[in-house]
């Protein structure tokens, strides 16, 4: 589990192929949610304080999935 709180940390985590990324910054989480919704990357999203992002590589692209409860993982 890799925790990020800034956009730079998120970019680093994505480029280093971290499997599980947890965003601890609420503003950054909201920004990711809005951008992802705009570009239709979301499979499932809930407005909660802090999001776990699970990357799934498909055909060279990155899909982002937001889940509410981290305890299942």
Predicted regions and their residues:
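Acidic, low-complexity, intrinsically disordered interaction modules
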Residues: 39-51, 56
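A short, exposed loop/beta-hairpin motif centered on an aromatic-Gly-Thr core
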Residues: 1-3
